[in-house]
């Protein structure tokens, strides 16, 4: 059974971990935009921008949520925090679907639409009043993170043609980081487990 509230010390750790993630995200925006602009490809630039902004928004909302002390404000920010996770996951898929898989028939746009539709539905659910929805949302996060396996074969084909199989390994690593991290999420009745989940989330973002 999950804790309803985190202790002050735990919230400080939560702020520090995702505060570090926020700085990482801001740095990533600069690095990715420079890399994208150098390619001169508008698809690369646009998808990199979407990913960087979605990732950073996730860390920003989480940091503000955990830093809030007023119960009413914290409740409101919690919804934004959970919504941003859906956007973070969808943003992660954007470069793969609109750059790597765009010319692979259904796979690029099909996967892009599927993931972003799931994210929009997830955001909608995050603002609905539902009992015991945290575990359901975590399952949704996991399913979204691993839906890429349906496009595994075309991804491998693209990476082999472009001699960039290492990208696939990083992608798998990100999924493993997030999957292992959910163990700590479900164990957050124990102190500082939520902060540990944050670290795995940052590890996932570093891979992808």
Where are these regions (language model features)?
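Multi-pass alpha-helical transmembrane bundles in non-GPCR membrane proteins
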Residues: 1-208
């Amino acid at each position: 059974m999950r804790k309803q509230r985190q202790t002050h010390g735990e919230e400080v750790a939560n702020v520090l971990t995702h505060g570090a993630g926020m700085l990482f995200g801001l740095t990533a925006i600069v690095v990715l935009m420079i890399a994208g602009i150098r390619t001169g490809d508008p698809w690369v630039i646009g998808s990199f921008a979407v990913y960087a902004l979605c990732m950073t928004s996730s860390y920003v909302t989480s940091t503000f949520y955990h830093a809030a002390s007023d119960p009413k404000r914290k409740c409101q920010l919690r919804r934004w925090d959970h919504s941003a996770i859906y956007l973070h996951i969808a943003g992660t898929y954007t470069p793969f679907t609109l750059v790597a898989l765009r010319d692979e028939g259904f796979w690029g746009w099909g996967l892009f639409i599927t993931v972003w539709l799931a994210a929009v539905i997830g955001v909608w659910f995050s603002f609905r009043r539902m009992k015991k929805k945290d575990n359901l949302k975590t399952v949704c996060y996991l399913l979204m993170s691993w839906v890429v396996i349906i496009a595994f074969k075309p991804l491998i084909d693209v990476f082999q043609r472009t001699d960039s199989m290492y990208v696939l390994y990083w992608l798998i690593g990100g999924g493993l980081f997030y999957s292992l991290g959910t163990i700590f999420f479900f164990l957050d009745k124990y102190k500082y487990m939520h902060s540990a989940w944050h670290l795995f989330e940052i590890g996932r973002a570093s891979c992808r």
